[in-house]
Design a protein with these regions (language model features):
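Short, Lys/Arg-rich flexible segments
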Residues: 1-76, 83-138
């Protein structure tokens, strides 16, 4: 057991810094997981639903000190950001396309329906409180 002597007083102590650090790391991970779960809920509330595939695909991942929210559905970016004239830097003229039945359609694009960015950014105070609560309970 380490000991320290000064002015005739000897103090013995136990170094628990490893356990304290591990407890803090676990608390941060639990807090980030709580943030991820909350963000997924907010995104699922905001996403437009047709078949439910996009809503059901929204997940989160914790990697170290970071929490990511996202989806693996290929069209999610078009829902989030819009297309054509409705997306920043998008095409500014209408276009035509033929559907699977051979019918032609003219479009300007689709309006954005943000669900990931607002879920991540509009609840910073709540996420901060979730992390704080997790650390306080470590």
């Amino acid at each position: 057991m380490p000991r320290f002597t000064s002015n005739g007083i000897t103090v013995e102590y136990t170094d628990n810094s490893g356990e304290v650090l591990a407890a803090l790391e676990n608390a941060v991970e639990r807090g980030l997981m709580a943030c991820g779960e909350a963000a997924v809920g907010y995104a699922q509330d905001l996403v437009p639903v047709d078949t439910g595939r996009l809503r059901g695909s929204i997940t989160y991942a914790v990697d170290g000190d970071d929490c990511y929210i996202g989806t693996n559905v290929e069209y999610a970016i078009y829902v989030e950001m819009g297309t054509g004239i409705y997306t920043p830097g998008g095409r500014q003229t209408p276009w035509a396309y033929k559907d699977e039945l051979g019918k032609w359609h003219k479009t300007h694009g689709s309006k954005p329906h943000p669900f990931l960015v607002p879920a991540a950014s509009n609840h910073a105070d709540e996420y901060r409180n979730l992390l704080k609560e997790s650390l306080m309970n470590a």
